[in-house]
């Protein structure tokens, strides 16, 4: 299990009688890219919040980088990098000022801080834009800057919640080139996405629907096993099956 970055068993989150995440089992090896797919309201973000140590599970158990999601949430927060769909940096600050600010938050100082900032600026292709106001950046550049800030403290696990939503195809491709490079360097990546071309770049994917993992595995193997042409067809079939055979929850309401 020491080779697993994320390991959950029957991890569940319930708000009142509303079941949002239902007994999810995950085993994500270190250095892998795991894609979490599903429609809006399927439970992806709730699952991520539990794994980040922000939201306590109702039941079940899980570890992130060896730390218990219930007992050691603060240790988890120190070890991971998180990036949301919404640009959450300071738009009135320049690229360099944002990096310096977040570097200070993570406790980086002096030459170590400067070296890490320069390393990430080069990785993200932001060289020459250091003095540009962050608010004037395009969507793709903003996301690359946000990724840099999430990587400053060299996290072992990077959690990305729909990082390329609303970003043009070229910028999405460049962003994923960076993610792939990080995985090669040993960083584990958990990413949620609506884009099937991005899902195909993952080592493994899981499709969540009404809080349940309907299917998981390697993209190519899933396509072959279900005799479909691509992931789009596979997930359309899954949703149609659920429409005809909705999940039962007794007195619980699934959202």
Predicted regions and their residues:
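Catalytic Walker B motif of ABC-type/P-loop ATPase nucleotide-binding domains
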Residues: 158-162
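Conserved ABC ATPase signature
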Residues: 92, 133-137
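ABC ATPase "signature
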Residues: 216-217
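Conserved catalytic motifs of ABC-family nucleotide-binding domains
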Residues: 154
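Conserved ABC ATPase "signature" region
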Residues: 100, 104, 109-129
